[in-house]
Structures are given as structure tokens and as C-alpha cells.
Amino acid sequence: MLIALLIILAYVIGSIPSGLIVGKLAKGIDIREHGSGNLGATNAFRTLGVKAGSVVIAADILKGTLAAALPYLLHVPIHPLLAGVAAVIGHVFPVFAKFKGGKAVATSGGVLLFYAPLLFVTMVAVFFVFLFLTKFVSLSSMLTGIYTIIYCLFVKDPYLLVVVTLLTAFVIYRHRANIKRIINKTEPKIKWF
């Protein structure tokens, strides 16, 4: 029973629509009606600006970190990655935002920040290298996911490998419209990096 309650709590934490809340507070807008219509950090940066976008990405990362920490904080015998995955599902399908959320990148990163901090640090570095080279946030996110799988092949943690592989597949699936735009050369590039 405690495990089920913890999973529900992790999902609810993930469901907190950071982009929607920050958009309303910072600019008085619903970011789902602007830019890509997505609740995630990339649309927040594009729609709300760097300061508000930074708050959204920090909040989305924190959701994953907090959810992964719940088993330790509440002394519930469940793997932290499972709790983290529940938060990622909440972020993508948030009960508080009609089940239309972000693309799982920042919240997945937050899970890894708690469970595998070295992986998280290298992921951030790899992401910015890809971003510098490609100027596409979406492509950089997907390539960083593939990097995490390769990293996990060298770490003796089968749970981490399975979860990272599933999360990367999910991130790529959530970016399928971006993939089409990249192929059609209509995906917007960032201009500030």
C-alpha cells in the first residue's frame, strides 16, 4: 500500500505544470497557447524568456529529483528510479493540465541528478556540446539521451540501463514532430548559443 501511495505522490509531483504556473505568474499567459504549445522548458524559454525559462527548467528538474528521493525520505522500499519514472509520466501526462505536458527531458534529468549525479553532470556537458554544434535543442536532447545509454553500458547497474533506455526511447518518441521538422528544415534553431 505504501509503495502505491508513493508512486501516486511521485506522479502528482511530476504533474505540477511548472511552465503553466511560471507563465501565468511571469507574463500572465498560458504557454500552451504560444510557441510550440508545449509545457516544457524549451517552449518556456522561447515564450517567456531566459529568466522565466530558467525557473521552469529548474522546477522540472527538481520534480524528478524530489520524486527519486521519496523512497529515502519516506523510508518506503521501492527503487528510486521507479519513483522517478512516475514523476516523468506525471510531467508528460499531468493530471493538473489535461494530461498534456512536457517532453520528459528535464524531469528525466532530475531523476538522474538524484540517482546518478556524475551521469547528470556529464549529460549536461554533452547536451551543451551538441547544442553548440547543432543549434537544435530537440536534437541535442535526443542525442544526449543516446549518450546516456552508452554511458550506462559501462556502469554495472542494470536498473539504470533499463530505465535510461526506456526514458530515452520515450524522449525520442515525444520529439517525433521535431524530428519531422528537422528533416523538413523547419525546426527553429537557437540564436543565443
From Swiss-Prot:
One of its GO terms (molecular function) is acyl-phosphate glycerol-3-phosphate acyltransferase activity. InterPro entries: G3P_acylTferase_PlsY (IPR003811). It is a multi-pass membrane protein. Catalyzes the transfer of an acyl group from acyl-phosphate (acyl-PO(4)) to glycerol-3-phosphate (G3P) to form lysophosphatidic acid (LPA). This enzyme utilizes acyl-phosphate as fatty acyl donor, but not acyl-CoA or acyl-ACP. Probably interacts with PlsX. NCBIfam families: glycerol-3-phosphate 1-O-acyltransferase PlsY. This is Glycerol-3-phosphate acyltransferase. The gene is plsY.
